[in-house]
Each structure stands twice: as structure tokens, then as C-alpha cells.
Amino acid sequence: MAGLQLMTPASSPMGPFFGLPWQQEAIHDNIYTPRKYQVELLEAALDHNIIVCLNSGSGKTFIAVLLSKELSYQIRGDFSKNAKRTVFLVNSEKQVSQQVSAVRTHTDLKVGEYSDLQKTQCWAKEKWYQEFQTHQVLVMTCHIFLNVLKTGNVSLSNINLLVFDECHLAIQDHPYRDIMKICESCQTCPRILGLTASILNGKCDPHDLEEKIQNLEEILRSNAETATDLVVLDRYASQPCEIVLDCGPYVDRSGLYQRLLNELDEALNFLTDCNISTHSKERDSTIISKQILSDCWAVLLVLGPWCADKVAGMMVRELQKYIKHEQEELHRKFLLFTDTILRKIHALCEEHFSPASLDMKFVTPKVIKLLEILRKYKPYERQQFESVEWYNNRNQDNYVSWSDSEDDDDDEDEEIEEKEKTETSFPSPFTNILCGIIFVERRYTAVVLNRLIKEAGKQDPELAYISSNFITGHGIGKNQPRNKQMEVEFRKQEEVLRKFRAHETNLLIATSIVEEGVDIPKCNLVVRFDLPSEYRSYVQSKGRARAPISNYIMLADSDKIKAFEEDLKTYKAIEKILRNKCSKSMDCGNTESEPIVDDDEIFPPYVLRQDDGSPRVTINTAIGHINRYCARLPSDPFTHLAPKCRTRELPDGPYRSTLYLPINSPLRAPIVGPPMNCARLAERAVALICCKKLHEIGELDDHLMPVGKETVKYEEELDLHDEEETSVPGRPGSTKRRQCYPKAIPECLRNSYPKPGQPCYLYVIGMVLTTPLPDELNFRRRKLYPPEDTTRCFGILTAKPIPQIPHFPVYTRSGEVTISIELKKSGFSLNLEQLELITRLHRYIFSHILRLEKPALEFKPTVADCAYCVLPLNVVNDSGTLDIDFKFVEDIEKSEARTGIPNTQYSAEGPFIFKLEDYQDAVIIPRYRNFDQPHRFYVADVYTDLTPLSKFPSPEYETFAEYYKTKYNLDLTNLNQPLLDVDHTSSRLNLLTPRHLNQKGKALPLSSAEKRKAKWESLQNKQILVPELCAIHPVPASLWRKAVCLPSILYRLHCLLTAEELRAQTAIDAGVGVKSLPEDFRYPNLDFGWKRSIDGKTFISNQSFSAMERESDCRLDITTVPDSATSSAAHHVMYTQMNDQMSVNCTPPCPKSLSDLQGVCFSDDCKAINGITCNGLTNGNWEAESGVCFQKDELIACKQEIPEKSTSFHVQNLPNDNQPILNECTLSKKFLDGNVGKPISDECPSTCTSDINYESGLSSGYSSKTLGPNPGLILQALTLSNASDGFNLERLEMLGDSFLKHAITTYLFCTYPDSHEGRLSYMRSKKVSNCNLYRLGKKKGSPSRMVVSIFDPPVNWLPPGYIVNQDKNCDKWESNETSGESVMANGKIDEDFEDEEDEDLMWRNPKEETDFDDDFLEYDQEHIKFIDNMLMGSGAFVKKIQLSAFAPPDQNYEWRPPKKPPLESAPFRSEFDDFDYSSWDAMCYLDPSKAVEEDDFVVGFWNPSEENGGADAGKQSISYDLHTEQCIADKSIADCVEALLGCYLTSCGERAAQLFLCSLGLKVLPEVRKPVTNTSTRGNYSLDGRTNSELSCKGIEYGYLKIPPRCMFEHPEAEKTLDHLISGFENFEKKINYQFKNKAYLLQAFTHASYHYNTITDCYQRLEFLGDAILDYLITKHLYEDPRQHSPGVLTDLRSALVNNTIFASLAVKYDYHKYFKAISPELFHVIDDFVQFQLEKNEMQGMDSELRRSEEDEEKEEDIEVPKAMGDIFESLAGAIYMDSGMSLETVWRVYYPMMQPLIEKFSANVPRSPVRELLEMEPETAKFSPAERTYDGKVRVMVEVVGKGKFKGVGRSYRIAKSAAARRALRSLKANQSQVPNS
């Protein structure tokens, strides 16, 4: 064995890493990166006649088609005017159509096909002339062409290119030969391209081969060139060390071998002798038997008895299957005979050895030799290699970076990092140093040899390191049809290859199939177990040994070794001949050995600074630098950009090289090197010169490394800001990071408290009922009270004028009321006494009528930021005008019922006297209960037919009088008085949106009208009071109803003024709009755009809906929305089951009502009935939740049987037994958006379906274009969807987002004409990043102006004149015991819990304030983790979360942490950062039934701890006050900036939007002159949340972008080259219906980076960068303006369905873009080919997916067809080209593109596609899990998705994304199929 000296990696001098197999793509240092051989062959073919010797058919097509395309400028003209034609010749008729389709697919040339000799022979000359006239490429069989030439119908001088397929035929006597003879006599012979794959068939003699090639070259007058796939793969790779080992003969000591051999021989002879007459139809009965026995015989021969035994056992099992299925008697007999033989063999073996252990006596010498070789590869122990040096030596050309990033620049600690990474990246680089393949001939040999090696590994520790597997190419060929059986096999094989590729196995035993086409890593050991029998087999197995140090070992038996040595000589000779034929042949066997000594002297290095350690490029390292630079240029997966070097010998001897860089490098001119005395030096010298030039133009940095996209030269662009120092955790700009901001107070309301004797302004709050509540929504058949019917109303008294703002709606019980704020009088003053009176009344309204005062708030109008007064107005002194109603104010001051219950005594002597008029417009207070906080009721009706003696509705009491006597011990003095039907005064103070509509303006489901009617007419469901027992409140009901609207009115006023202020501010900063509006101008009303969505269809009841349809005259006609648009379901559940509702919007502490939510009942002790509990303080809304936690938005149907006999509630003590309780509570997904996780579906986040079309009614010739956007629209842009308002910023944000991208893209494109796309897109992504937008938004002060959370007056609204009192914040209401009865949610004692009017039917699901993060998946995980932690008690909430049952009304409302958190409560963790603390989703998991008083939750202050947790309590944690501050995620601020941009864009146009961006600090326009003073210091917040130093842009003027000057390079022959290159493009221009003025744009749009023949323009990448943004904007804008008014969710889906590569690529193919595409990339060529074929079959577009599906039936192998990105790219780049060519006109681009896109836009708008991955995650949010990617045998990616409990689904594709969507699609198909089968279960 000593003779075997292997160069194993472990023994190699450079340390084992050198031989590591996974150094896949090394960057060469001494030669230019080799280009693909097809590319080189094409280059040769353009230069001279060649014969291409290629192995694969596809490569030949590529060269032939591209060559004809490159020469096509010669054939496009008119045949009669000397244009030429191209002819493809094939040998047989079958091949004609193949060639035709290839040419048609890839070019726009007209192709004629001729295959029928008989038919064409009789054609006359005219007929042929006509054919040549109409076609440019003619494909025909050689016989036809010969005939045409002979008859003189066409002469060869009219042909520019002759392609001979299978040109080797010309050696024999063949038409090809005759055609070439005719060529000889022709003066202008066409260019000739010969294609052959069969120059090497079977064995051939090198001498013959050489002769054959020379012969062929002479006949075809061409040079034969072969591609590298016939020579060892890459001629630049180091050659493996080849070793032939003689293994010696097998000594059969036991005689077993001989016996087995005899048995098998006999059996085989017997089978051969069986002469069964077989008809040709029948199967030969002995075939299977022969096959099996001969396999067994071969194994015995090659591997020995031990293996023969193993294989016999395997075959017996196989035979059993055959025997079982065999029908025919004779066949069975033979099979049974075989079976017997095999069993006999097994028996014989058993006598000699136990089957378990491996005995070396019974294996052949070959096997023993093999095991010896493998022992050599045993790795060393790890410790030896702990030193870092040989880990990575950057100067070696096979330096491998272990980090993922390709962009690593040298830094000191890199090496150490690398070292750590290796530990994790691979199982362990050391144990797997071997990466080997053993080639065997037969399938069974592979299987058994694998078992043998495994067995040997068990017994021999030296071999234990081997982890082997076998692969037998069984059906692995790419294109055979595969059945199920083979499919399984195929999967197994793929798995084997995956493991080998991942180095989980280090040895592969393979049959020859793996020689070809399978993607396998570079091996360092290849063993031919059976000798290669022909050259091809030799070269391909050898070609697998591609690691830098590798061995190619051939094992030979002694008897064969002589013969093989001859063969090997032959192979070597053939290889040498082919090598010389190798295109651009360059034999580098000797290059390595040349001494590289004093090259530096020959040519000095390029050094940056003259010191020793300075970066330098020497003549020896220059080439590596150039290769590295090219590799870093942007390119697609198919193109590996490489430099091109041409070296010529100069006449006087020296060599000179010219270097061409790829066309997307800014250095475009060819670099000519100095003359050098050898070719290699010439190449190195030119590289050195090139490095110098690249450094000078800034493409190499000062370390002489390629400049990454990050180290951009355009620092000013990125405005690299010092990131604010902040202790806030989370990545800036993300949703995870939230910060607090003061809520803005409009300047005009700030410090506006009137002072005595100073001029004041009095505004009247006008209220008009514009849309009365329709009957079907008026459940109680209440009378409607239009506010305009009574003259007394409210006004605002302020010291400052209030700007004009649009009218806006509020929604009261009577319907939609339009509010206007009109100036009544100004310039008057009041004295101190009057002011004090007014102030007291103002306070009275908020503290008593609205009950908004609470300990945390203090009334201090003189100190408060915002302190105007609200006061009653009335028509006074018969003047008919409104004025302050001092008399009324004074009356109230005097009234006894003003605050408490008046103490009136009636007696028999002075009985109660009923006066009807006192009760007509009254609010009454029951005097006998709830003394601390009496209830107030509106009188709805006076029942004159009832008296206290009337029958009581429930059986316990006879009469009303008896009830009061029994229950309250009250005697009535007047038994004839009528009774009063009353309604609760409103507790719902948020009237911004209507109750019966959800946020999108969709009506909620109602129960049937009949049920409701019956219910409301029964006395049991009414509150009936006795007038004598009630006091009358001094404030009349009509005014009270108006007072209830005040919080909503003032809040909306406040917001609109903030928006107006922003509009004025922008007018100053950006010069868009006017600072102050004209006097006579008012913007149109604020409207949700819902007008017509409220129609009969939306209600379940069928009554006509006339009331809503009548538009009142003061309404504008506003763009409206058909139902379909609003169909995405609510994200707020609003239940309208009248009596049993949860009145949701109440705030815990003072809700006035607590009723049922469809079957959620409260029994006395508030325990859960049947698992349904009402739990959770979420954002101050009571949320009802069924016992199931609603996770995400799964469809939940929780059918709960609720016991009929739940405890009744007393309604005025009327027992109420048959309270209607619904029997099921089915919360469908439509109405329930669970509380966990962000809504992902489009059903949720969207609110406003329309953006208000404010243009429609602008009065008096002004327009928002000149004045600036409507404050209503600005407010929309400031409102997050979390605020649950009638509108939000989402639609505007999407529009702004796409315009922002467009504006920045155009700016960068025009400003940096020399930057390549990688840099431009890096700059763009930095500028449009959320982080940057957040910074700009913050600088502008947007966060303070934003509307972030739901308006909930008792919790987060600060009434005017109040301040938050910091000291009292912790006051706490301790005891929960009130007279021993449980306190109900509304603070009443439960025994007189009244079934109140359900004020708010909305079940608001307080939602995270951001809806979509970059990766919505992460969210749910976060939320779930959060909830788990909560439930585990790791948060600040402890295991038993305590919640006071319900806090009583006058408790303070601040969040505080629990009073005494037990020790085990861990601090809050940072993963909670993404919570909106004001809307506490998680709390809904807490169970109130466990509540205890002491750990009371209070709702107004919230202290989330910092990142590192509250453990170190010394740190200040952010706590914020809900009244004056808001907590906003950074990303929401970025969204708001985009929405504001959208708002300016829609209102004022594109130029205004660009100016707006400039004023923000995002440069999208060039500056005309520098500002005089630029005060853009970073804004500091003053208290009011505005920046102190507003960015003053007044000094800067912005100009217009200029089109970059040149699109064509200076070039002597530029025009001529251009005409050549775009010949034929006029047809394309016709097709798209646009003529280019500058054709260079057209050429650039179609030039791929690999197309180096275009020397006059850039490649399409820059235009694609531009076009991408333009199309995105145009399509988004089109969708936004769609009259269907899509909701934000639909808009997002449509946008991603239409703006994606698949759609663009499909359209590009549909409109023939691919035929004009200029690229030289073999892989890309094939992908496009596949895709085009696929599109033809499919002939229709598919949405969303980058993968269009191939046929669906083949479930197992669903491989998606790949969409060539380049096709989508040129679709975009053409848009960019048109934009530039048309002088930057978006209209022109849309004119060309809309007709192409329209059918799809229509199709998708009608039926919105969703990406399969998203759809699956929405369908199965909890259970769908995607696996990491695995590689398949041909290098694709496979992904598996498991839907827990429903199965696993695989998808395959070229990238993870593609495979993932394929897997998701299959999962969906399966899930949907299952759903449809079990609808009823």
C-alpha cells in the first residue's frame, strides 16, 4: 500500500481547507474569470466560420439562434434590394419544426419552413423568389436546399449565413458535401456555422479523430472549436492527479466464490437454452430471470461473495412482488426458479460466514483497495487546526468567505468572526474533508457497495468518519415521463444529492448517470470502480474532481490493466486534440509553473501612498482585482459578468491586450495595454492599467477594493444624520419602536381663555339634522329630535379668531347632524362677573351633564393650554339673533336639581300635581335611588292611559304603586297621574361615526324588524317611571341632547384646526397653497364618502330606505361607493340586538349601561355563563369575548347554548323572566377580528372606503390646487386606522408611497447619470426607508398632530379649561363594597340595573396602531409570545391577574402597575414594545371573575418598562398621560408622512407634491440657488409639539429636473452601430404604438448586461430602475382613482397583484418584447424559451405568483415554471425609456402601457388575487409552518409547508420565494378541496 501516495487535502501543504469541496466559486487571481463556453463560441462564430462540437443539443440552438440574431441586420431589408437571407439546414424532415420554433421564439424574424422535397421540387423560380422575399430565415432539409441551388433558383451570394445541423455528415457522401462544393465556386461565400454533437461516438482512435476533424474543417471551410464540456470542464481548473491502481487477482481460499459462480453460470445457461417459442407480441418469459441472475453474477464478480449474498437477499424480496402480480403460469414458473437459485446462494454463503459481520476474505481486492484509499482521507483530530492562519488566506484564489455577506470589506476582526461562523454553518468542516464519488457500472453494484462501506465503517474505526450513500440515476433524467413509482425513487435520489451537497454525507456511490448534468459539489476524490469504457465516460467522471487538490483514481484488475493503459493513452490524446480545438484555446498547464519573480520590475505596481503598508495593486494581483470588480456589478442570477480580454500579437513580435469591462461598468471605453513580450504579461499589464483607471473614477475605494453600494460617493444625498440618542428600544423607523409625543393644540385655541374687558369672539355651534335615522334603524320607534327645532344651542367664547374649517357630521340618536362653527360676533368684551358665571356653567356642562370630571383632571382655565368657554346661546330680546343666554345660566345656578336630588316632600294635604308641559322637553331624575350619582332620563312619552294603579308588567306585584311601596316604602299622593316612558340620557359620547355602520360605512346585521317591534312594544322592555317620584332637571332635554354632542364636536374641531394649521404651515414652508384662506371661502364638508353605501341592500330588513336616500340640500354630492367596494367586512363588531347588548363604548369606570352582547349575559355575581365572560379593559371599551380566545382572524363560530333561565335583571323592579336570549352566538370572521395579532387580512384594517372628493363643491372659483388641500383630507392623512374613525390614512399612504418612490427615483436617475442601478437603488432605499421618513416627520412635528387612538372622552379627552393634575394621579378608590351588593359595570347597584339603551353597538376591537409591518408574520409570533408571558405571569401582571369587578364611576382613570407585584413577577421584556399601551389587547385575556380589590387596574397611566426591564427601577420608564400625550410607533409616523404626500398629490398635483417633499427635507428637485440663511437646525420640541425653528425653505428655489444629457457614448461609428443594433425594432414600435425620437433609449431598454456587442449605450438596468417606479406609480394612481373606490386592503392586494415581475414578464412576452431582447446568456436563453412556450400553452395571465403553474394534475412533482426576471425588467425599462424619450411625460407612458395592462386591471379588480403564501397564512394563521429551504438534485430549492393536522405540502422552484409560493398553493388547493367536502360537519 505504501506505493499509493495520494494528495489528500489533509496532507497538502496548504492545510486541509485548500481541498474543501465547498469552495464553489472561487475568484481567479491569475486569469480573467472565464466566460461561459457558449458565449465564447458565439464570439468565435461572429468572427469566422466555425464548427461547434458540443455535447448538448440546447447549447447548439443557443449559438445558432443568437448568431442569426446578431447578423439579422443583413437580412431585414427587401430581398430585391440586395438584402440577404439566412438558411438553416437540417438532415431530416423531423428536425425542421424544432429549429423553426426556436427561431420564432427568440426573434421577430419571419421564418419559412420547407420539409417536403416532392412538393418543393415542382416550384418555379418565381415561387422561390416569393418565399425568399417574404421570409428572412429559411429552415429546410439539405436535399431541398441542394435542389434550389442546383436549379439556380437562388444563389449563395444572397445568403448571409448557412447553418449546418449535424455537420459531421459532410464527411461521407451527403448533400452537405455537395452544397459546400457549390460554395467553393462562389466568390462571396456566406458565413458558415457547423453544429455537431457526434464527433466522438463510442471508441475512436485519436489519429482517426484528428483526421476526421481536419477533414471536416476542410470540407466546411471552418475551424472546429469545441466547448469545454468535452474537455475537463473548466480549462482553467487545476487538473486532478490521475492514478491507475492495479488491484491484483482475487484468491478464492474457501472455494465459495467458485461454487457460487458455477451455480449462477448453470442457471443462466439453463435459461438461455430454454427455447420457448415467443411470438413477437408476447413478452419473453425469461427476461426478468436473466436480468436478475446476471446482475447477481456481476456483483459476485466485482465485489465478491459477501456482496453477492446481500444482493441475493434484496432480489428475493423484489421477486416476491413480481410473483404476486404475475398472472401467466409460465412466467411464474421462471420467476420461482430464479427465486430458488437466489435462496440457494444465500444458503451457501451462510455456511461460510455470518451475514452480520464483514469478512475481508469474501470481498474482492478492488474493494479492499477502495477501503485503503478511503482510510487515507481520514481527517485529523480537530485540535491541530485551531490556529487562524490557514482558515482563510485572502490572497489565495480559493479564499472562501464563510460569512453570508458578499460585501465584506477587509476588517481586522473579520477573521475571528469567520472562525466562529464556521462552527455553526456546517456540521463541522473538519470531519467532512472528504467529498468523493465512486463510479460503478451497475445499479446493484452501487446499492451493495454502499452497504459494504457502511458495514466496514462499523468495524473499522479508521473508516467510521465516512457517511456514504448511493444514487443510481434511476429515472433521474430530466425529461422522461415519470410514474408514481419512479417519482418516489426520484424523491429519494434528490434527498441523497441534497445531503451530499450539504456535506451531510461525504461519499457518493453512483452509476454513470451522475456523470452528466447533475449539480454536484467539487469533489476531491473520484474513484472509477469499473474502468471507463469510452472517452466521454472518462472525461465526465474526471470532470467531477474539481476541487483544487483532487485525485482521480481508476481501479483495474490485473488482467485488464494492460488493455486499459492503451485506452488511457487514447483518451489523453483525444483530450489533447480537443483541447487545441478549444475555443480561445489557452493551455495553462504551464502557466502555474512559470516563475513569478520580478514582474514588479517589468511594470511598477499602482500604489496609493508611498509607504510600506499602503494598499497597492501589483502586476500579479491586478487580474484578481478586475475579476472581483466585475463580480460586484449588478446582474441577475443568470449572468456572471466577466471582463473580456483580447490579446493580439503585434507585427514586430510583442503582444498587446485590450480589456473590455462589462457594459454596466461606468468605465466603458476599451482599455488598451502596453506591448509586452509575452501574452500573459500583456494581459496582466492591461489589468493593472484598468485598476488605476477604476480607482481614479471612484469605482475602487482607497483599499483598492470594489466600492460597495453603501460607500456611495453621494453622501449629501443620504444626509447621514446622527441618529437621535434615545433610550427607546427598537429599530428606528420600525413598528417595534414607540415613543411619546405631546398632543398638538392648535395655535388658535392655545391660551384663548377670554379675559375681562378684552375683545372676544363668539362662535355659534350650528347643528342641523341632515340625514334623519331611517325607520329600520330606529328600533325603539323613538321620536327624532332635530336639533334645529329649538333655538337654544351652544356657542364658543374665545379670545382668538378661529379659522374657517369645513362643516362636519356627528351621529346622534336622531341621525346625522351637520355641525358648523360660525362667527356670531366679535370685538365685544365681558366683565369679570359675566365671565365667572360663564366659566362656572362651562365647568358644569363637563362635570355634571357629561360627568367627565375625575380626580386626575383639574379645572384651571387660566393655566390650561386650551381654555375657551362653551356657553348656551338663545334668541334674546326679540331681535331674532342669537346671543349669550345669561338668564338661562342664572336659572341653572339657582336650581336645586342642578347637581343633586331636590328634597321635595308631597303629602296628602299637598299632593303632587302633574303638569304636562313640564314634562314635554324634560330630563328627569328618580329621587329614590342612586343618591350619589342619580340617573337622568329623557322623557320619551307620557302614558296618559296608565296610572300608578295600572297592572304591573310582572306577576310579583299587582300595581306600580304596590311595587314602589314594597320595594322602596314610598307612598304616592296622586294616584291619577299618568306614567312616563323614559330613555336613558346618553352615555355614548363618541358620536364621530354612526352606530349602525361599521368603520367602512357598511351596515351591521340587524335582527328582523318584527322581533324588534314586538320587543319594543311590550311594556316589559320599557322603563316606566312615576312623575311624582322624579325631579325635573333644569337643563331641558333638547339642550341636553346637544350637550352630549359637545365632546365629539370640540374634538373634531380641534383636529380640523390642527390640520388647517398644518396646511398653512406647509404653504409657508413649501409654497404650496396660501397661508390664510380668503374670507368668503369655505372648504366642502367633511364626509366619509359613505353617502350612498347606506341603502336597502345593506340591511337585512327589507323596508325601503327612503329616509336615508333623501339627500338634504345642504349636502354636497360627494363621490360615493357602491356596495361592492365596501364589502370587506368590519373590523369592529357592532351588534344590534337591542335589549341584549353590550353597550360597548363605555369606559369601565363610568359606563351607564351594561347589557348583553348577543347572548352574553350577566348574572348577579358576574360569573361567566357557559364560559362566555365579559372580560378585559381594552382601551376603555368593554369587550365581550367568548370562552375561546379569538386568535388572529380565524373564523370562529362559537355556538353557545345559553341557559334560558339566566338571572333576570329588574327593569324598574319589573321582573323580567322571558328575557330574550339568543341561543347561539356565532361570531363570524366577518365581524370578529380577534384580539391577538395584527389583522392581516384585507378585511380588517381598512376603514375609509373613500377619500373624499373635495373638488366637487369648491365655491367661488377657488380650488384646492391653489389654496392647498382640504383640512378634512389632511386630517384623514393624520388619522391612523387605530383611531377607528370614519376615515384613515391607509389609501392616501399607498398613493403617497408610490409617488414618493417615483419622485425619488426620477431625481436620482437624472442627478446621477453615471451611477449604476445597484447604487441608485441603495440610495433610494435609504431615502424612502421608514427610518428616514420617520425622522423627517418628527422634525416637522407630525407626531403631535396625528390622531392615534380611538376618541374616548372619559378616558383620553381633555375638556377645554382642564389640566391634568399630576399629584392626584395616584389617588385611588380603595373599597369596592357598596351596601354589600355587587357593583355593576355602570356603577349602579345591580338590583336596579337598568337595561339601558345600547349606546354603542360597536364592538371596537382596539387594534394595534400599525397594520402591516414589513413582515406581518413576526407580529403574530410576538403577540402570542406576549400573551403566553402574560398568562405565565412573566409580565408585570402576576399569575392571578386581579381586576376590580368594575370600578365605580368617580374613580380616577389612570393606568398604574398593580400595587404590590409579588416578587416572582419578572420585569416587562422588550418584546412588548410593539404594543399600543392605550389599547391593551392583551388584557382581554384576564378573567374578571378572579378579581380582587387590592390589585385594582386603573386606566389612564401606563408604565411600560424599558428594554432591559424594570428590574433596575432607578431608570425612568416612559409613562404617559392619555389626555395630553400619545404613544406612536415610528413606522406610523413614516406612514403619516406618506399619507400627507398623497394628500398634497391628490389635491394640488405632482409639482406641489414634489415641493412638499423638498420642504420636508427629501430632495427630489434641483435647487436653483442657495438659501440666504438656512435655518434648518434640528427642531427642538417646544411644549406645543411644534418645532421651534421651522425649516425655512424660503431662501431656496426649486427648479425642474433635467433629462441626463447623454444616452449614447462618444464613439466614432455610433450612428452606424445604432442602426445595426436596432434593425427590425420599427416593428416593435408599431406594435406598442409609440415612435422613439431618440432610438438609443430604445436600444438601451433592450440591452442586457451580458450583451457586450452594444458599445454605444448602457444596459437596461438604470432604465429599469426608473421604469419600475413609474409603472408602480401609474398603476397605483389608476387603482386609487378607480371609481370603485377600493378599500385599503383591496388596494394593497391589487397593487401587489399588478406590480410584480410575473405580470410584467407575461405581458412582455405577450407583446413580443423577448424577440427584441439583446442578451448573451445561455441560461437566460433557456428560461425565456421555457417561459414563452409555457405562455403559449397557457395563453392567459395568472396573478400574484412569480410562478405560473405547469399542469396541475401531476400533484407529486408540482414544479413551478420560472419567470425570467429579465423579461419583467425590460417591460419596466421600456417604460423608463419612453418616459425619458417623451421628455418625462407620465401621460405618454400611460398611453402606451394602459392598453397592455387594462385587461388585467379589469380582471383583477373584479376578483382580487392574493399571494398564496398570504392567503394560506390568513386561512391557517396558527398552524401553517414553512420549513427552511432544501436543495434538490438539480440545484433548485424545495420548501415544505406543514399545516398542522392537515398535511404537508412541498413546492420546488429556483429560489426560496418561488418554492414557498408553490408549496402554499398546493396546501391551499388541498385545504379548499377538503373544505368543500365537509360543508355540513
Curated annotation (Swiss-Prot):
Q: Which residues form the Dicer dsRNA-binding fold domain?
A: 622-714
Annotated ranges, domain DRBM: 1808-1873
- Which ranges carry the Helicase ATP-binding domain? 41-217
Q: Which SMART domains match?
A: DEXDc, DSRM, HELICc, PAZ, RIBOc
Q: How does it assemble?
A: Component of the RISC loading complex (RLC), or micro-RNA (miRNA) loading complex (miRLC), which is composed of dicer1, ago2 and tarbp2; dicer1 and tarbp2 are required to process precursor miRNAs (pre-miRNAs) to mature miRNAs and then load them onto ago2. Note that the trimeric RLC/miRLC is also referred to as RISC.
The task this protein performs is described as: Double-stranded RNA (dsRNA) endoribonuclease playing a central role in short dsRNA-mediated post-transcriptional gene silencing. Cleaves naturally occurring long dsRNAs and short hairpin pre-microRNAs (miRNA) into fragments of twenty-one to twenty-three nucleotides with 3' overhang of two nucleotides, producing respectively short interfering RNAs (siRNA) and mature microRNAs. SiRNAs and miRNAs serve as guide to direct the RNA-induced silencing complex (RISC) to complementary RNAs to degrade them or prevent their translation.
What organism does the record attribute this protein to?
Answer: Xenopus laevis (African clawed frog)
Listed name of the protein: Endoribonuclease Dicer-S
Family designation: Belongs to the helicase family. Dicer subfamily.
